[in-house]
Amino acid sequence: MEQTVYLQLEDGTCLTGKHFGAPLKEDVIAEVVFTTAMTGYTETLTDPSYYGQMVVQTFPLIGNYGVNPKDFESKGIHMSAYITREWCSYPSNFRCQMDLDAFLKQQNIPGIYDLDTRYLTRLIRERGVMNGRLTAACPDKTSADALKSFAITDAVSHVTCKEAYQIPSPLPRHHVVLWDFGAKENIIRKLHALNCDLTVVPASTTAARILSFSPDGIMLSNGPGNPKDNPSIISELSRLCKSGIPIFGICLGHQLLALANGADTEKLKYGHRGANQPVKDLLTGRDYITSQNHGYAVKNDSLPDNAVLRFINLNDGTCEGVSYQDFPGFSVQFHPEACGGPHDSEFLFREFVALMERRA
């Protein structure tokens, strides 16, 4: 028998749906966000940047091709709960190893389906991102007030690696230190494809320790949470900017690099999450479709004199990328390594390699 469960938002809205996935043994409280991606749900589920969030899939039917571990962007699911209109209980794909329900159970993540995800998405767009509670008991309206105090804290420490490790390339040309704030596997794949040896280090690593590896370049990964919650990382990163070593930041890495250079960040009303976000390259005038997953952005008017705004979002004009003039570094808010998603901006990895080659 299907269990009725409830999604309560901090504004008092309560939606009813049906439970799937792991047993809902206790209430789950998290930030409720939506993604507009039509495919790549396995990559979405295993993206560490969703730590502390419940994710709404705007596409109505999820799970058609099942789940295959080769599609994982990390070792498991980091989000708190999964929300969809309908899930496919009989997936059809030769690569399928399990269905969506079995995967959620394996990862101990509850889900809710058969609720109006279109209404929920429009609500978030109109009122902004809200905290929510997934519960098996019909909630009292007065309990919604308690949700407002929830905040995602210390997020990066929950998704970073615990100790440094090496990923050698068969044909190494460059040595890159990947500073792991919740790195996606496809960042590693893209760097490997460009013959980069990798040393992956935890978020708590100092600048001195990173420099001790004698890297040709430093990659700042994606990750979850408010970038301003990482003052020690920002401080260490500011030291690395003076080293002369090429630096490339993606998503959270982009925000941290901006903060390390004196810029500011702000929380967006409902963020950019999906595989269809248009950006403009102000350097070339070209437009690209990009994959994105972020709730914060670098403030355009806060960029310091050594920073040049390179990419902007064509929907709202927010900062999507910065180039730095006094050291060999650049960063983007979107995901050039997108999987699944558009590959329009993969060339940025080659630009990073070119910076390393010019310095060699």
Residue spans for each PLM region:
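Short clusters of small/polar residues that mark proteolytic maturation junctions
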Residues: H19-F20, F59, Q292, S323, ...
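Active-site-proximal beta-strand elements of phosphoester/diester hydrolases
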Residues: H175-D180, T290-S291, F330-F334
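A glycine-centered loop/beta-turn motif at secondary-structure junctions
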Residues: G321-R359
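RNA-binding accessory domains that recognize and position tRNA/RNA substrates
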Residues: M1-H175, W179-A208, S212-F213, P227, ...
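Proline-centered loop/turn at the N-terminus of a beta-strand
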Residues: P110, H175, P246-F248, D264, ...
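Catalytic beta-strand/loop cores that center a nucleophilic Ser/Cys/Thr
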Residues: G285-F327, A360
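Cysteine-nucleophile active-site neighborhood
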Residues: G217-A297, G341-M356
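Residue-level detector of beta-strand face positions
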Residues: Y6, P278-K280, G321
